[in-house]
Amino acid sequence: MLLTGSRGAGKTTLIDALTQGCDLPGVRSYARREKPDGPPDCIFLENRRTGERRVIGRFLGGRMEPEAGVLDTFGVQALRDAMEGKNRWAVVDEIGFLENSSPAYCRALEELFRKKRMLAALRKADSPLLCRLRSREDCLVIDLDVLEDRQEHTGAGFPPEKGNL
């Protein structure tokens, strides 16, 4: 299951709700901001199994610059850890543009998709990796922006309010 949507659409919130109480392997990326309303100064990648994390992107010269070497080593190993676990499912939150800087990470990620059932958040953007993942026939893609649009037009909430199932 692939969740996509604009920034703030609820991809991570939904993944957290769906996996609550489950100890699923995989990776999680998140931004660190020095100012709450400012741009991120760096992006971390965390191994969900071990809790280890590394910086995979730094905000330099007005743009986010990938740390491809970290994805090549730490990132690939975190994905391999998820592949080797006993769980049938793995979680990746979120896949964006930084991953494209590391062909080894992209290959390991696609291998994880072949070996495990996946719950993943995809940045709403176009890149070769994101397009390949969204076009997989074995994945259900849910666009949270489309669900939000439907809610506005029909009045149906997502998730449904208690008692409105």
Model-flagged regions — what are they?
Residues 60-110:
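Phosphate-binding/switch loop-helix module in NTP-utilizing enzymes
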Residues 3:
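Hydrophobic anchor at the beta1->P-loop junction of P-loop NTPases
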Residues 7:
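The conserved Walker
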Residues 20-24, 86-87, 114-117:
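Short glycine/proline-enriched coil/turn segments at helix->beta-strand junctions
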Residues 16-63:
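N-terminal phosphate/diphosphate-binding loop that engages ATP/GTP or pyrophosphate donors
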Residues 11:
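Conserved lysine of the Walker
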